Amino acid sequence: SQATIGTIVADMATNDENEISVKTAGGYMEALRKIFVIEDSEAWNPNLRSKTAVRTANTRYFIDPSIGVAVLGLGPNDLLKDLNTMGLFFETLCVRDLRVFADALDGEVYHFRDRSGLECDAVVHLRNGKYGLVEIKLGGDRLINEGAENLQKLAEKINTEKMNEPSFMMVLVGTGDYAYRRTDG
């Protein structure tokens, strides 16, 4: 979530009789970071041809998405009936695994979103300057195509005079029998 602490407190107030302060909620968030329950993904700020402002708010993820599933008391059937929620937990799972792989390569995983709504779920960036753009989707041809189009739009905005082109663009999906390379990149 990119929600501010204030927004989280306001959401909690609508669902709970016991209100907490923004300061207290911020303290809880910091405690959850320290005990490795949540982790922030920083915003990626590439050199773009466009003057569109890049949003720089961190995205907060559970270290292990099963924590969120357990807190909400959800089971497999609940997730299958609510694919939007399932998609959020799937994205968290994928980001966690991408972080493990990136760390082994001395890299980091970021996210990207600009004011126009163009976003990239994960940017795997290595210390040598190479990077890859990743869209995460549960699956289905329509969503895969949307993800690929989104990555193309972002790649076209990157100022390749100031930084390299992406080393790869990937739509990471939860369904399908195999990986394949598309003709559009």
For the regions a protein language model found, what residue spans apply to each?
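Accessory nucleic acid-recognition modules appended to NTPase machines
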Residues: 1-130
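Conserved nucleotide-binding/hydrolysis micro-motifs of P-loop NTPases
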Residues: 67, 116, 140-141, 176-178
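Short amphipathic alpha-helical segments
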Residues: 74, 146-147, 182-184
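Active-site ExK catalytic segment of metal-dependent nucleases
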Residues: 125, 131-142
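Mg2+/Mn2+-dependent nuclease catalytic core
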Residues: 139-160
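Short, hydrophobic beta-strand segments that form beta-sheet elements in well-ordered domains
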Residues: 165-174
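Domain-level recognition of nuclease-like catalytic cores that cleave nucleotide substrates
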Residues: 174-185
